[in-house]
Amino acid sequence: MSAAAVSIDRITPGLRPEGPAWGYQNWRRLLFLHWAVPVVALRRLVPRSFELDLHYGTAYVGVVPFVMEGVRPRLAPPATAMNFLETNVRTYVVKDGVPGVYFFSLEAASRLAVQVARLMFALPYHHASMRLEGGPESTRYRSRRSGSGALFNVHYSVGQALGPSLLGSLEHFLIERYWLFTEREGT
């Protein structure tokens, strides 16, 4: 763990930011896939304004497919909420002492969600054709990005519940993140 990492507050990031939320969303049927990657290679891909967040010296890249449910702006009635499939490719960064997520790519099965996220949040969203099959015990998830042919296909079975993540554990490092960071062109 780096000297800078010691000063990162890994407990209070779970507290809600001040002010009203921009909207509502629920994530369901998540799968977290992660790989350790060389820090030097990852550093070249992440903007310099972000510090790589390392778990005991190791950098991680993750692929996270899931179902996004009940997505709507704060003032919109629940009846307007959208549900769609999404996959994100991410790594973990720190900005001003706050641990968060940096997305390399996000795919969504909703063209509207892609357009709004790109415009309002400068996130690298892409439209994709996606399919989710199976039940709560076994799931197949497929995604093909529109216009590029990029394909993601995974089949997984649910194992035993892990329980709450423990501070300092890899699970806590990867999952207990409540901030996302991006850069807008020109800032």
Q: What annotation goes with each model-predicted range?
A:
Residues S2-D9, M68-A76, V98, Y125, ...:
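N-terminal intrinsically disordered, cationic/polar leader segments
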Residues S2-R74:
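Hydrophobic, proline/glycine-rich low-complexity stretches
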Residues V6-I11, P78-Y92, L132-E137:
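Short, surface-exposed, charge-dense and proline/glycine-enriched linear segments
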Residues T12-E18, A76-A79, N83, V114-A117, ...:
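Active-site-adjacent core segments of small-molecule enzymes
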Residues G19, V39, P77-T80, S165-G168:
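Intrinsically disordered, low-complexity segments enriched in polar/charged residues with Gly/Pro
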Residues Y24-Q25, R44, H55, N83, ...:
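A generic structural signal for short, solvent-exposed coil/turn residues
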Residues A59-A108:
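Extended, compositionally biased
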Residues N88-T187:
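Internal, well-folded beta-alpha domain core
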